[in-house]
Amino acid sequence: MTHEGKEPVDLRVIRELWGVICERADCPDENSYTSRLLQDVKGIDKVLEKVGEESTEFILAVKNGVPERTTEEAADLFFHVLVALRAADVDLSGVIRELERRRK
């Protein structure tokens, strides 16, 4: 995938990240941040708390006009949204299909 004037983007990392998140959910590892987040006693509320926190940090980074920080916070937010999808038992493929549908 490319955007005019930008270098190509390899989206395989998204598939790989989703696979790791699903693996951590199915086979928890006490040394894994993702596993601990998914196993937290607060349940999905803990995951959603992180989504809210990362959303706020992303908004502030954009508002402050700091591209590097915006990139970091976008990655954090995207990761936590993926974890929330897994915690809610929503498959990423459904989200991708919905994006494709909306693109038409």
From Swiss-Prot:
For this UniProt entry, what is the primary localization, expressed as one broad class?
cytoplasm
Q: Which GO terms describe its cellular component?
A: cytoplasm
| Localisation per UniProt entry | Cytoplasm
In terms of Pfam families, this protein maps to: PRA-PH (PF01503)
Biological process, per Gene Ontology:
L-histidine biosynthetic process
Question: Which pathway, per its entry?
Answer: Amino-acid biosynthesis; L-histidine biosynthesis; L-histidine from 5-phospho-alpha-D-ribose 1-diphosphate: step 2/9
Q: Enzyme class, one word?
A: hydrolase
* Keywords from the UniProt entry: Amino-acid biosynthesis, ATP-binding, Cytoplasm, Histidine biosynthesis, Hydrolase, Nucleotide-binding
Q: Which GO terms describe its molecular function?
A: ATP binding; phosphoribosyl-ATP diphosphatase activity
Query: By its UniProt entry, which CDD domains does this protein fall under?
Result: NTP-PPase_HisIE_like (cd11534)
Q: Which reaction does it catalyse?
A: 1-(5-phospho-beta-D-ribosyl)-ATP + H2O = 1-(5-phospho-beta-D-ribosyl)-5'-AMP + diphosphate + H(+)
Q: What is its EC number?
A: 3.6.1.31
Q: Which family, according to the similarity comment?
A: Belongs to the PRA-PH family.
- Annotated protein name in UniProt: Phosphoribosyl-ATP pyrophosphatase
